[in-house]
């Protein structure tokens, strides 16, 4: 049995909490459970709206998806959320440029499947803390390429510039992790 708890925090820099969380510990569509965290892009229009629309769209798609593979279900749901945000932004100038990060997961048997777009993170906490997702950010790319070390990255002025987001481009590239 899976038990969860979620909480969001506005942090010290923002005036508006752009986080949106969804947790379903029981079957939804063809998934045994699903957990989603989205964080609207802070410097962009309608970040809080983007995160809510993305999660709501994903939940709706997961609930009605005929696909069987958990990877395909999550990829489809994130893709539909991406399309929905792009459609809404095209109709309203106030929504132009909106986007959100997404981390979605499902526990299937003894495996945790994680889908990730952006720089929101999923950690496993047991006897130690282990970061599962990899940030899609400018600074993380600099670390991966050897341009800067992780200590420098933590304080880098551009650490919040993300390279992937749901709603940012016509197609969304999703990373998956199987734990």
Label each residue range with its predicted role.
Residues 1-179:
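PP2C/PPM-type serine/threonine phosphatase catalytic domain
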């Amino acid at each position: 049995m899976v038990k969860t708890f979620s909480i969001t925090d506005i942090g010290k820099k923002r005036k508006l909490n752009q986080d949106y969380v969804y947790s379903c510990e029981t079957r939804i569509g063809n998934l045994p459970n699903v957990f989603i965290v989205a964080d609207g892009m802070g410097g962009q229009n309608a970040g809080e709206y983007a995160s809510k629309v993305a999660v709501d769209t994903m939940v709706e798609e997961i609930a009605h998806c005929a696909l069987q593979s958990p990877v395909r279900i999550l990829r489809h749901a994130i893709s539909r959320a991406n399309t929905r945000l792009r459609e809404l932004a095209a109709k309203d100038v106030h929504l132009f440029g909106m986007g959100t990060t997404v981390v979605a997961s499902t526990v299937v048997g003894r495996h945790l499947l994680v889908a990730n777009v952006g720089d929101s993170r999923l950690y496993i906490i047991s006897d130690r803390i282990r970061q599962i997702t990899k940030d899609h950010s400018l600074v993380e790319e600099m670390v991966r390429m050897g341009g800067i070390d992780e200590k420098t990255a933590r304080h880098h002025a551009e650490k919040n510039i993300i390279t992937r987001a749901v709603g940012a481009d016509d197609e969304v590239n999703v990373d998956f992790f199987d734990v």
